[in-house]
Each structure stands twice: as structure tokens, then as C-alpha cells.
A protein has these predicted regions:
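Beta-rich strand-turn-strand
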Residues: 167, 196-203
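C-terminal lobe/tail of nucleotide-utilizing enzymes
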Residues: 22-164, 179, 184-186, 190
Length: 203
């Protein structure tokens, strides 16, 4: 084809090739057997809230999260009274992280006395987070959505959306696809053939 600039090349072919590549990357990243995400959070309220929001949208788009890495925890050997309130607040926030993210394992790393850089410090960080565990091991195997029920009792599509507000949810339907919207974000879920002719009962 001829592009507006007058060059004769297979521009559409290049565009299609790009989309094919992006689709392969998406399939790789959304396959929990191949890829998973670990969210890093500091034990601070604002950071926790933003991490919760990120986790919601990762679930919405089908990306598996297998662990929470809690970073920059003031270690017990810091006994200066100046940090007493900071340490107490961190412990409260760490407890909240454990509650908020449900079954996801929470691994903890201390606040080092210097910037983390270089192999020696990175090894110390890895030891603190993983100890004897293999970092390449999948820490949690959860589903981003599943279908429950049967033709007699009805089917339920379950999409875990931690921390999402029901008032922010919208659901649209075409014959073979559901579009789920959470605030400004949306996800399209392709339905199996058995559900194509069924009506949505409730959300």
C-alpha cells in the first residue's frame, strides 16, 4: 500500500504484526502458569491505599498477583525513642496489609541503613524477603474470574475485585461478551457458548 507520505511499504502488515506481538505479550502476562506480579508496598497509609487500587485493576484485567512485598520496615534494633511512634504506626499498618490482601502472602524487608545497591545489599534484601524460598516459585495460585453453578441453579460469574466500590461498577452485555467497568477502567470477558443466550440476573 502507499502511505500518505508517498512511501510504498506494507504499513498495515507492520501494524498487524505489532498487534499480534502485543497480543502474545498479553497472553503471556495473563497466564498464571507463566507470569505473576508482586506488589511492593511501604507500611504507610497512602501507599497501602494506592497498592490496593493497583491490585483491584490487576484483577480486573486478569493479571495474577502472587505476593505482597512489604518494604522499608524499621528493624527492632532501632531503639531511639524518636522512632517509637513510627515503629508503632508501621506495625499497625503491617497488620492492616495482612488483613486487606487476604490470602496473598506478605513478605517483609527491613529499612536498611543505606541505599540498596550492589550485589551484597541485594543479596541481603533477597534473604530478608525470601529466606530459603525460591523467588521464582509461584507464591499464590488464585483465579481472576471463575464461573460457578449449572443450568438448573443458574450460573454465577465471580470476578474478585478487592477494594472496589459497588457504586463504581457497571456491566454491559453483548451476546458472547461481558464488559465490566470499574470507574474509568474496563475489562471484556468472553463468555463460553453455554452462556450466550442467558440473561443477566443481578450484579
Amino acid at each position: 500500500m502507499t502511505t500518505p507520505g508517498g512511501r510504498d511499504d506494507d504499513a498495515w502488515g507492520q501494524v498487524n504484526e505489532l498487534f499480534d506481538t502485543l497480543d502474545k505479550v498479553r497472553k503471556l502476562l495473563t497466564d498464571p502458569a507463566m507470569s505473576s506480579i508482586r506488589l511492593v508496598v511501604n507500611p504507610e497509609k497512602m501507599v497501602i491505599k494506592e497498592t490496593q487500587r493497583t491490585y483491584t485493576y490487576l484483577n480486573l484485567y486478569g493479571y495474577a498477583t502472587d505476593a505482597i512485598l512489604c518494604n522499608r520496615i524499621i528493624p527492632p534494633e532501632v531503639t531511639d525513642p524518636y522512632f517509637a511512634m513510627w515503629k508503632a504506626n508501621q506495625q499497625d499498618n503491617i497488620a492492616y496489609i495482612g488483613e486487606a490482601f487476604g490470602e496473598l502472602p506478605v513478605m517483609k524487608a527491613p529499612l536498611f541503613g543505606h541505599e540498596v545497591g550492589g550485589l551484597d545489599t541485594l543479596r541481603k534484601l533477597a534473604d530478608a524477603l525470601y529466606a530459603d524460598k525460591n523467588p521464582a516459585t509461584q507464591m499464590f495460585d488464585g483465579q481472576t474470574h471463575r464461573i460457578e453453578g449449572d443450568s438448573t441453579t443458574g450460573f454465577t460469574l465471580v470476578v474478585p475485585l478487592p477494594f472496589a466500590n459497588k457504586d463504581d461498577l457497571d456491566l454491559y452485555r453483548s451476546r458472547d461478551e461481558l464488559t465490566l467497568r470499574v470507574g474509568p477502567y474496563r475489562r471484556n470477558i468472553v463468555l463460553p457458548y453455554a452462556l450466550w443466550d442467558l440473561e443477566i440476573g443481578d450484579v
